[in-house]
Amino acid sequence: MTHQTHAYHMVNPSPWPLTGALSALLMTSGLIMWFHFNSMYLLMLGLTTNTLTMYQWWRDIVRESTFQGHHTPIVQKGLRYGMILFIVSEVFFFAGFFWAFYHSSLAPTPELGGCWPPTGITPLNPMEVPLLNTSVLLASGVSITWAHHSLMEGNRKHMLQALFITISLGVYFTLLQASEYYETPFTISDGIYGSTFFMATGFHGLHVIIGSTFLIVCFMRQLKFHFTSNHHFGFEAAAWYWHFVDVVWLFLYVSIYWWGS
């Protein structure tokens, strides 16, 4: 590394890909054990090792970028392409749920009563909690943009304030969604309506939790002065992800809550 004559990052040997693969094996095996034998020990072990692997792997990346200076502009460009491709893959992931929803709702079968929502299903009112959730996420999109602009201008205080507001709105959204799930008059086992509703909104909720975790890490890193106005890809990636989650919710709201009701 001392005689390096290029701007690329030659990664040092790391144990985390191996521990990540083993934890994934434990998690999938644990799911089978849970489904068939009602035992969660293997699943919990898999989740714990997976969480530890993610923490330690990302900790190493922070060290390489912030303290060792390995993330040159050309390396950051590669990371940006990687994040863009990851978000594109997530778009197709959600496209599958929307496809299932529209396939079922545009031509309801006789078993559903020939109508949508299916006979016997009482849909949620889109003008109540779902509309509040929409406004909460749209507001969080504004505050994350404020945080980004503050960081670009070197205004640390405003960046931290805006990031804190975004995290608070993300947590509030999750609590609202949990309370809505608690009150729904249908379940995931209520035919195609229940399964598409809970799969689509449930995975979106999971993405909000993941995005909130990313932003909390960014908040803690900013408290330690890790970001500068021209070196902050970790925050940029989290902001892109948050905007993606925001846009997916708009499609969910219009499709499943408003049109689908």
From Swiss-Prot:
Q: What is this protein called?
A: Cytochrome c oxidase subunit 3
Membrane topology, record value: Multi-pass membrane protein
Broad class of enzyme this protein falls into = translocase
Main role?
A: Component of the cytochrome c oxidase, the last enzyme in the mitochondrial electron transport chain which drives oxidative phosphorylation. The respiratory chain contains 3 multisubunit complexes succinate dehydrogenase (complex II, CII), ubiquinol-cytochrome c oxidoreductase (cytochrome b-c1 complex, complex III, CIII) and cytochrome c oxidase (complex IV, CIV), that cooperate to transfer electrons derived from NADH and succinate to molecular oxygen, creating an electrochemical gradient over the inner membrane that drives transmembrane transport and the ATP synthase.
GO molecular function annotation: cytochrome-c oxidase activity
Cite the EC number: 7.1.1.9
Report TM segments.
Answer: 16-34, 41-66, 73-105, 129-152, 156-183, 191-223, 233-256
Record's family? Belongs to the cytochrome c oxidase subunit 3 family.
For this protein, the record's Pfam families field holds: COX3
Protein keywords: Membrane, Mitochondrion, Mitochondrion inner membrane, Translocase, Transmembrane, Transmembrane helix
Keyword Translocase listed: yes
Q: Which InterPro entries match?
A: Cyt_c/ubiquinol_Oxase_su3, Cyt_c_oxase_su3_dom, Cyt_c_oxidase-like_su3, Cyt_c_oxidase_su3-like_sf, Cyt_c_oxidase_su3_a-hlx
The Gene Ontology biological process terms listed for this entry are:
mitochondrial electron transport, cytochrome c to oxygen; respiratory chain complex IV assembly
Which PROSITE patterns does the UniProt record give?
A: COX3
Q: Which residues lie on this side of the membrane: Mitochondrial intermembrane?
A: 35-40, 106-128, 184-190, 257-261
Reactions it catalyzes: 4 Fe(II)-[cytochrome c] + O2 + 8 H(+)(in) = 4 Fe(III)-[cytochrome c] + 2 H2O + 4 H(+)(out)
The domain of life for this entry's organism is: Eukaryota
**Membrane topology (Mitochondrial matrix):** 1-15, 67-72, 153-155, 224-232
Q: Which SUPFAM superfamilies match?
A: Cytochrome c oxidase subunit III-like
| SUBUNIT field | Component of the cytochrome c oxidase (complex IV, CIV), a multisubunit enzyme composed of 14 subunits. The complex is composed of a catalytic core of 3 subunits MT-CO1, MT-CO2 and MT-CO3, encoded in the mitochondrial DNA, and 11 supernumerary subunits COX4I, COX5A, COX5B, COX6A, COX6B, COX6C, COX7A, COX7B, COX7C, COX8 and NDUFA4, which are encoded in the nuclear genome.
Localisation per UniProt entry: Mitochondrion inner membrane
Q: Which GO terms describe its cellular component?
A: mitochondrial inner membrane; respiratory chain complex IV
